[in-house]
Amino acid sequence: MKKILAAVLATSALVAPAAAQEITEFRIGLLGGENAQDRLASNECFRAYTEEALGVPTKLFTAADYNGVIQGLIGGTLDMAWLGASAYAAVYLENPDAVTPVLVKTNLDGSFTYHSIGFARADSGITSLDDMKDKTFGFGDPNSTSGYLVPLVEIPAAGYSMEPGEFFSDVVFTGGHEQTIIAVLNGDVDGGVTWADGQGAWEDGYNSGQLRKSSDAGIVDMNDIVEIWKSSPIPEGPIVLRNALPEDVKTKMTELTAGLHDMDPQCAYGVAAGETAGFEPVTHDAYKTIIEVRVAQQSQSN
């Protein structure tokens, strides 16, 4: 792992400006998906560790939607974020020199994939996509990989049109993963999608992901919902660092994050949205397919 980590750091050094200025603060962007208070609480330990490691004030930013973090990274107002694969693709396609992927969250078996999970209320009688005919389907955010991009490709490929009124009565955005879960529970939509590693027990919300976080938080009792669809494996999104950061800052943050699980497993649990084996090196190459899918999706919508 140390050799791979060194290679990642060396690669990021090649794309960084030669004369980066010293930083006076460090800013970590948190993607939407759950309420801002819970996002801040889950990442406060990491913020404190970062502030100690860098010796400068460190702030967490909770954007209202995915695009807020995407634009913050592109515009240089954010220094670090854990992105979904589609959100990383959005950053890369707008400015390929803005950030570099350095690490990825791994599952307990060492893999770094997860799934888009379709679900409905257990008392709805819906047990599969077939049962969603003439029903309302909720999706989290147009920049979410599991909350929109992958379902947009895989659900039509399985024979179910995503055009509102053709199979589903309507296809709507809820604003985020947690919002989708709440919308299904409240009956605002008949079914929805969110993300999970797909490992472990359903009644726990799997081992990690939004179902696990929402179950831990008491937002959902997993006995009240059922799985109605599951995507093929999706590459877990990368932790990225802004390329314009000084090299010593990028090195410190990569090493801090890579060692977080060993140093403080409970903190890593909160940051990783559940059980994790830790954070391992990753490069841009892991996301080439997702970038191609996003380009194709944008071409179709234009």
For each feature predicted by the language model, list its residue ranges:
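A bilobed periplasmic-binding-protein/Venus flytrap-type ligand-binding module shared by bacterial periplasmic
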Residues: 31-32, 115-126, 230-248
